[in-house]
Regions:
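Acidic, glycine-rich flexible loop segments
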Residues: 98-115, 121
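N-terminal signal peptide c-region/cleavage motif recognized by signal peptidases
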Residues: 11-15
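Positively charged n-region of N-terminal signal peptides that target proteins for export
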Residues: 1-4
Length: 139
């Protein structure tokens, strides 16, 4: 009976993960240097939207967001929510924004999976024509 319960719990966990493939911790890779920069935890909030919070910063773990605006100004980068207000639409996260802590700017965001990797596209325009992409790998 105990084995049956354990198997059911494992199947349920696998099913939940399969339903929400974006949720979890991702290692961010700098698109210019190719180096690992941080770990971001993507989660689904009670409001049904998806967010991403920096949980680890590999260089300067005590760094502050000195370029950020408003409530994010001078806040620790670890703990900062950089992926905001994303909605799951047709297998992609869309409609929200991404914060670049290096320059403090918010960009339109789109997130999708490709070959098991997360692709985050940050852009100046809603259509994603003017911007750049980063590839993140699951932790």
């Amino acid at each position: 009976m105990r084995n049956l319960f354990l198997m059911a719990a494992l199947l349920m966990a696998a099913w939940v993960t399969a339903q929400v493939p974006f949720v979890g911790e991702w290692i961010t890779i700098d698109d210019e240097s190719g180096e690992q920069k941080s770990v971001v935890n993507i989660y689904k909030a009670d409001n049904g939207m998806y967010y991403g919070q920096i949980v680890t910063l590999f260089e300067e773990p005590d760094a502050l967001c000195t370029e950020c605006k408003d409530a994010d100004y001078n806040q620790p980068i670890v703990g900062l929510t950089i992926v905001r207000d994303m909605q799951l639409v047709d297998g992609e996260l869309r409609g929200g924004k991404v914060l670049d802590p290096e320059n403090g700017k918010l960009y339109y965001a789109k997130i999708y999976l490709e070959n098991g990797k997360l692709i985050l596209r940050g852009s100046l325009d809603k259509r994603g024509l003017i911007g750049r992409s980063q590839t993140w790998i699951r932790k």
